[in-house]
Amino acid sequence: MKILRKNHPLLKIVNHSFIDLPTPSNISSWWNFGSLLGMCLMIQILTGLFLAMHYTSDTTTAFSSVAHICRDVNYGWLIRYLHANGASMFFICLFIHVGRGIYYGSYVLSETWNIGIILFLTTMATAFVGYVLPWGQMSFWGATVITNLLSAIPYIGNTLVEWIWGGFSVDKATLTRFFAFHFILPFIITAFALVHLLFLHETGSNNPSGLNSDSDKIPFHPYYTTKDLLGIFLLLLVLMILALFFPDILGDPDNFTPANPLNTPAHIKPEWYFLFAYAILRSIPNKLGGVLALVLSILILAAFPLLNNSKQHGLIFRPITQVIYWIFIANLLVLTWIGGQPVEYPFTMIGQIASITYFAIIIILIPISNTIENNIIKL
């Protein structure tokens, strides 16, 4: 078996990636989230496949087909709630994974980091088109509001919106193409994830100390396979608790009402994992400005490798930047809260302050604190 896994053309790739991979001996549980994201992706593809067998992407039957899955299909309710809450678990793991990358300076591996940003954007697109499929009130109006933002693009905006809609409003053509996108995108995510791993294994993994770990590597299996298994079991435990005890806690009550183009919900808002970006969008009174801020709220992650002027790797020995980092996390939580609130005083003002703070921390405060810490080292 030992000879086979080292010489077989296919098993050799698996062996170099998951068995004999030299890994830093000190990586903590924060490094588990990559494998957890892989697990989430597998759960989403499997549950999504079974849901697609019973779902119909037609405006007249979409809502009923989801109800049919929950009522009449064997364990359909479980598959549906695992898929819906699996998306939330996916984004929790994704946010922690990105947060860990920022804290421990993983962005210096720029190819891996940039592929990660593409993965983040693709996952957000997949989740957005997936949220439209049940064809409830929030699905319909969410699709209308978010796709309508593209009309802010000068000259081609309106044409682009009608092209995406497949008509003059969100209708049957929109739902059908969103279902097609939702089906194909997870496989594109899988391909990007493999490229992400390929680039990571070119350089080797970062570690909590931020120091070179070439002199202290251990094989990935059995040490980190067992560690990842523990993380996977904990993830499955949380997911099952969510799906079985609190299946609708992260959903929107409006989505239990079938889509009605003649009746607008009181507060249109996306799923919780988009609220931070939605708050940034709403905090700018200008439509085009809001759309640009929305896109930049994710693309700003690409600035981390460019703005990195620190002589140290990661934040473990950098107390000033550590404080700024945790302010940044708190600010993100404030934005998430604001995104779910109505557009009125004082929420609009808090949202504007939090949005400015979000960009200021990344572009101004972190580079300044890096410079201060570099000078402290020289003392």
Curated annotation (Swiss-Prot):
Task: Give the highest taxon in the source lineage.
Answer: Eukaryota
Entry cofactor note text?
Binds 2 heme b groups non-covalently.
Q: Species lineage, top-down? A: Eukaryota, Metazoa, Chordata, Craniata, Vertebrata
Describe its partners and assembly state. The cytochrome bc1 complex contains 11 subunits: 3 respiratory subunits (MT-CYB, CYC1 and UQCRFS1), 2 core proteins (UQCRC1 and UQCRC2) and 6 low-molecular weight proteins (UQCRH/QCR6, UQCRB/QCR7, UQCRQ/QCR8, UQCR10/QCR9, UQCR11/QCR10 and a cleavage product of UQCRFS1). This cytochrome bc1 complex then forms a dimer.
- Which cofactors? heme b
Binding sites annotated in the UniProt record for heme b b562? H83, H182
Cited function: Component of the ubiquinol-cytochrome c reductase complex (complex III or cytochrome b-c1 complex) that is part of the mitochondrial respiratory chain. The b-c1 complex mediates electron transfer from ubiquinol to cytochrome c. Contributes to the generation of a proton gradient across the mitochondrial membrane that is then used for ATP synthesis.
Protein name from the UniProt record = Cytochrome b
